[in-house]
Amino acid sequence: MIFQNAGDYLNPRRKVCDQYVETLRCHQSMTKKQGYEIAKKMLATLKLPDTKHVMNAYPFQLSGGMKQRVAIAMAMSMNPKLLLADEPTSALDVTVQAQVVKQMMDLRDKMGTAIVIVTHNMGVASKMADYIAVMQNGELKEFGTREQVIYHPENDYTKKLLTVVPKLQGETDGE
């Protein structure tokens, strides 16, 4: 699972490498060195600069985008078939959002992981989702393919949501 606020997810008193390697070792049989190498490789895949620095940093020394990438890397290192992402980009500016969305999609495609994303951001949903379910107060208002919900919404609540869609900036596969 990828939690909404990675800053709350990561222990501020422990270095990233200690938390990351411990998480890997709890779920898979490996040495600390093997865990460190897996963590370093996954962080590099998410294009974190200077992975050695990130691994040796405390969470409070990292930006919000870096902490979110660490959380995504930790979750994806488990090789999940299904990943639940709760507002994975909510605390990020739109440029970093676009980068994180692209990296999550690249990992999804590379690893064959299905992602269920919970978000209020219809822009992020339209970029990441094949299917979209729109809910209001715990009630399903609309469900359909991305194209149906984004371009041909039937429900008034969905239409209102789409009027406030922030535009993602940055490069995403030349789109």
Protein language model regions, located:
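A short, proline-enriched helix->beta-strand linker immediately N-terminal to the Walker B motif
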Residues: 77-81
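ABC ATPase "signature
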Residues: 143-144
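Hydrophobic anchor residue at the start of the ABC signature
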Residues: 20, 72, 83, 96, ...
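A short, surface-exposed alpha-helical micro-motif characterized by mixed small hydrophobic
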Residues: 125-127
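Conserved ABC ATPase signature
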Residues: 57-62, 66
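Helical segment within the ABC ATPase nucleotide-binding domain
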Residues: 98-111, 123
